[in-house]
Amino acid sequence: MTDLRAWRDLRRKRREREAMLLDLGALVYELHRLGRRAPELLQEKAVELGKVDQDVRALEDALDGR
């Protein structure tokens, strides 16, 4: 993978991670506002976010030469 492509992938993954964080936060707030609980859904979303975060960290490490 060329460095340029890796940087583009990193930028895309960072945006995806940020959007997922915002969505997760909004979901937590809405559940709280409605007085509802959905731990399984929150766990599922957190796992998905964790996978994207791992991708971001791996790309950052690769680009930093670690």
Regions found by a protein language model. Give the residues of each.
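Short, charged, amphipathic alpha-helical segments
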Residues: 11, 39-50
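Amphipathic alpha-helical coiled-coil segments
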Residues: 21, 48-66
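Heptad-repeat coiled-coil alpha-helices
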Residues: 19, 26, 30-33, 37-40, ...
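Short, charge/polar-rich alpha-helical segments
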Residues: 1-16, 47
